[in-house]
Amino acid sequence: MKICGISDIHGDLNINIPECDVLCICGDVINLNDQRDIPASKHWWETRFVKWVESLPCSKVIVIPGNHDFYLERMYNECWGWFKDHMSLLSNKKLEFLIDESFYYEDIHFYGTPWIEPISFQKNKWAFERDFNENPIEIPKCDVLLTHD
């Protein structure tokens, strides 16, 4: 199986993605100019990003959010199950989002977690911050671990 990994695209969809079975996008997907604008982010994800995903030379795209993906943090806090199903349907089931979740593709176990340790002088400024001392993450044994930190 051929797996490709990228991160920190910040809205730049003019990337040459090689042919692969699975593309893993490890955070900071949204354009920096729109990162805190929820309506603009929603529109971008549902139109530009989904169309880009459908055009990629791969069978599956797995996304974990990054510290600039505020829209995904909001969806996670408010309606994660609905959002994942909605995006999967929009992309003809090509797109999979992971937040502390496993996903199996052709017997390969992927696990994704987006959390970052708070930056001491900027606490609560970024999406998906988590104090690992107070709230540690239990990562299962997996074949491919996707993180942003």
Regions found by a protein language model. Give the residues of each.
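Core catalytic region of metal-dependent phosphoesterases/phosphodiesterases
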Residues: 6, 11-105
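Active-site-proximal loop/helix segment associated with metal-binding centers of metalloenzymes
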Residues: 20, 33-37, 75-76, 85, ...
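Extreme N-terminal starter segment of soluble prokaryotic enzymes
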Residues: 1-4
